[in-house]
């Protein structure tokens, strides 16, 4: 993973990574906490450059981040835990009101996420926000028009359930995505249930296509 100590390098990576659709997608991670009045302390897994971290801090939450690598967010005062999700102990995750793990699980092998979800549940954190890429059947059509400019967007996903997902060549890339053959939404939700997690809310985003869950322990 690239070192971003140089401000110019950081700006280039920031503008490359944070497209409009990705910024809206990351805002939604924070928006799911609206109305959870018992949430003050948040553990964010996989913060990357720290946009969600900064939004959480700005919203008034006490934030700790966790990642396999040292922090890249550059936010003073945000505690960081350097750990592997596949090995982290539940007690390391304990003591928070909410755990956010968005767009991270797909970077692990499919069979490895059962144990990670079980660790989340065993931590006794009362609220969890989880999202993973969703490529199941969906249609997104939109049009913007005024007297000076117009733009349109259209996406139609329909037959991915017939195909196997092709993992990225990058070993740190995606190992799977929901909606492909062998990785259905029902399969993923069965893993959540097996870990002892209850779905309180499920939602979908586009054009960064993901399925989001607000989860709780029964």
Regions found by a protein language model. Name each.
Residues 1-98, 114-117, 123, 173-217:
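Conserved N-terminal segment of class I S-adenosyl-L-methionine
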Residues 10-11, 102, 131-135:
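Short loop/turn segments at strand-loop or loop-helix junctions that form parts
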Residues 71, 88, 107, 135-137:
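Active-site loop signature of alpha/beta-hydrolase-fold enzymes
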Residues 98-111:
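A short SAM/SAH-binding and catalytic strip from SAM-dependent methyltransferases
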Residues 108-120, 130-132:
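A short, conserved alpha-helix within the catalytic core of class I
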Residues 129-158:
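Conserved class I S-adenosyl-L-methionine
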Residues 149-187:
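C-terminal alpha-helical "lid/dimerization" subdomain adjacent to the S-adenosyl-L-methionine
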């Amino acid at each position: 993973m690239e070192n971003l100590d140089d401000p110019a390098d950081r700006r280039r990576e920031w503008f490359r990574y944070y497209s409009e659709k990705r910024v809206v997608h990351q805002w939604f991670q924070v928006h799911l906490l609206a109305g959870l009045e018992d949430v003050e302390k948040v553990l964010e897994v996989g913060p990357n450059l720290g946009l969600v971290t900064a939004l959480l801090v700005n919203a008034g939450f006490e934030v700790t981040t966790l990642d396999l690598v040292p922090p890249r967010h550059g936010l003073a005062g945000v505690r960081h835990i350097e750990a592997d999700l596949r090995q982290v102990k539940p007690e390391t995750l304990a003591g928070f009101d909410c755990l956010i793990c968005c767009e991270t699980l797909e970077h692990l092998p499919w069979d490895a996420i059962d144990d990670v979800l079980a660790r989340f549940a065993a931590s006794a954190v009362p609220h969890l926000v989880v999202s993973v890429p969703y490529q199941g059947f969906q249609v997104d059509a939109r049009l913007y028009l005024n007297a000076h400019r117009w733009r349109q967007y259209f996406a139609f996903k329909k037959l991915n359930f017939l195909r196997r997902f092709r993992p990225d060549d990058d070993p740190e890339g995606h190992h799977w995505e929901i909606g492909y053959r062998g990785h259905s939404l029902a399969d993923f939700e069965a893993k959540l249930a097996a870990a002892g997690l209850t779905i309180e809310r499920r939602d979908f985003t586009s054009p960064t296509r993901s399925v989001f869950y607000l989860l709780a322990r029964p």
